[in-house]
Amino acid sequence: MPGAVSATPPPELATAARTLFGDRLSLAVAYAGLLVTDGVVRGLIGPREAPRIWDRHLLNCAAVAERIPLGSTVLDVGSGAGLPGLVLAVARPDLSVTLVEPLARRTAFLVEAVAQLDLAASVQVVRGRAEEIASGGGGVEPLTGDVVTARAVAPLDRLARWCLPLAVPGGRLVALKGASAVEEVAEHAAIVDRLGGGRPEVHHCGAGVVEPPTTVIEIARERVVAPARPKPAKRSRGGRRR
Ligand SMILES: C[S@@+](CC[C@H](N)C(=O)[O-])C[C@H]1O[C@@H](n2cnc3c(N)ncnc32)[C@H](O)[C@@H]1O
């Protein structure tokens, strides 16, 4: 088909793909196939992303697996087309992964992708916002995980507010970030502390395998902090709420 994008890794990335996906490489190729066809047609992946689906998306996300302990439960917040959560589930059959995404069009794609890749035993899709999932609001069942992942969802302060309550005590937020990681840490470390998080750490994943390595900010959930209570409305002299 003219213009069709191949789902197999380009030759220069074949070694990295084998290293990161091992004997699950054919499953990763099947997922890439869904992304570059259905994912593009349904508007989950930009057409310009299709030719770089391996280096910018699949390998970039799979590199983060090295930061996730064996047998972890993972909540991927703002999964979109499954990045990084579905990639991690493909690369790591030991993980139990929940893909959290508020938009129905995206969760529909995710549910179909999970079924087509035969991953239903280890992956569930939950429609909702991170802040609802933490509190059990909006009719969504409250969930927590050992590791909470997020890529391209929000700046670090908002991400910490949404995601730290989703990590079990002692669990971690692993946020995939770009070149801004060090500045984001400097800017938001005080807020993270107030939210019960430990000192944010910047790690580079996949060094020597993917170029450039994937930068992540990791924050441990050290303390459980009650959510901020809404401020009471100001009263007028007559004691009535304004
Ligand atoms: C730019 S997309 C990134 C998607 C995917 N993580 C990726 O890297 O391709 C941001 C995603 O976050 C989702 N999102 C936005 N606010 C959210 C919230 N409060 N809770 C959970 N997901 C949210 C959006 O619906 C969207 O799918």
UniProtKB/Swiss-Prot annotation:
> Which region is the signal sequence?
none
User: What are the GO MF terms of this UniProt record?
Assistant: rRNA (guanine-N7-)-methyltransferase activity
Q: What Gene3D superfamilies does the record tag this protein with?
A: Vaccinia Virus protein VP39
Q: Does the keyword Cytoplasm apply?
A: yes
**GO terms for cellular component:** cytosol
Methyltransferase among keywords: yes
| Compartments it resides in | Cytoplasm
Q: What EC number(s) has UniProt assigned to this enzyme?
A: 2.1.1.-
Q: Which UniProt keywords apply?
A: Cytoplasm, Methyltransferase, rRNA processing, S-adenosyl-L-methionine, Transferase
Enumerate the Pfam families for this protein.
GidB
Q: InterPro entries of this UniProt entry? A: rRNA_ssu_MeTfrase_G (IPR003682), SAM-dependent_MTases_sf (IPR029063)
> Main localization of the protein?
cytoplasm
Q: Which residues bind S-adenosyl-L-methionine?
A: 78, 83, 130-131, 151
How would you classify this enzyme at the top EC level? transferase
Q: What is this protein's function?
A: Specifically methylates the N7 position of guanine in position 518 of 16S rRNA.
Q: Which family does it belong to?
A: Belongs to the methyltransferase superfamily. RNA methyltransferase RsmG family.
- What is the name of the protein in this document? Ribosomal RNA small subunit methyltransferase G
* Origin species: Salinispora tropica (strain ATCC BAA-916 / DSM 44818 / JCM 13857 / NBRC 105044 / CNB-440)
